Amino acid sequence: MTYPETLNWLFNQLPMYQLQGASAYKKDLTNVHLLMDYLGHPESQLQCIHVAGTNGKGSSSHMLASVLQEAGYQVGLYTSPHLKDFRERIKINGVLIPEDFVCDFVNQHQAFFEANDMSFFEMSVGLAFDYFAKEKIDIAIIEVGMGGRLDATNIITPLVSVITNIGLDHTQFLGNTLAAIAAEKAGIIKSNIPVVIGEYTSETQPVFLATAKANHSPVYFASDVIATTFPSDLIGDYQIHNKKTV
């Protein structure tokens, strides 16, 4: 398939949330684990920072990638959604994944994807992890797509987990209270792995503390940090919180 044909096929695998509603939301990570087994576990070859949150996770992910790149690391960045080109989701040091790699990945594995009903998101994550592993990057910044606990990215064991903030988003899938949504996003907290919390409320802080305690994970609150001001192309007062988190 050509690149446009490959994209057309990929986008046809998008979950039809608008038509199916909550039933289109996969309830576990079985498919992703199956995919990683099939690909030879590229995720286990990566050093990662995992970023979740309602708002600010994209900006924070890009800032983290920029800081680490300036420090001399080869940095993979996986984010979603894209603005113009699907390849914006997967970058190394700011350079988009090549069209040929996308086409070859899909063409090589299409039969497996179809046989196992892989979703667009699962295939995108598999593509990113496979690309980063083959390019032998130093570190990957992985942004959660939706929620956290059941997101396709939540198969990594990161160096640190980051949760920027909690708002009422995707309530049909994640719950209709801040505490319920916080619990879903706190699902990225791993055993003995530190977690940084960008912002919290009286409803969400107990959730973060309880989840971190259950996982024996050190927890750090960005609000406790007196951040040194540094220049950024990202404008808006809310970016101050993102800078503190980073």
Indicate residue ranges for each PLM-predicted region.
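Short functional linear segments
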Residues: 1-53, 60, 66, 70-71
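N-terminal-biased segments
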Residues: 2, 7-26, 86, 142-146, ...
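A general structural signal for well-ordered alpha-helical segments in protein cores
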Residues: 7, 32, 61, 102, ...
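ATP-dependent carboxylate-amine ligase catalytic core
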Residues: 22-29, 33-46, 70-156, 174, ...
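Acidic, Mg2+-coordinating active-site environments of NTP-dependent enzymes
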Residues: 46, 118, 136-143, 158-245
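Aromatic/hydrophobic pocket-lining residues that form π-stacking "cages" and hydrophobic walls in ligand
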Residues: 64, 128, 208
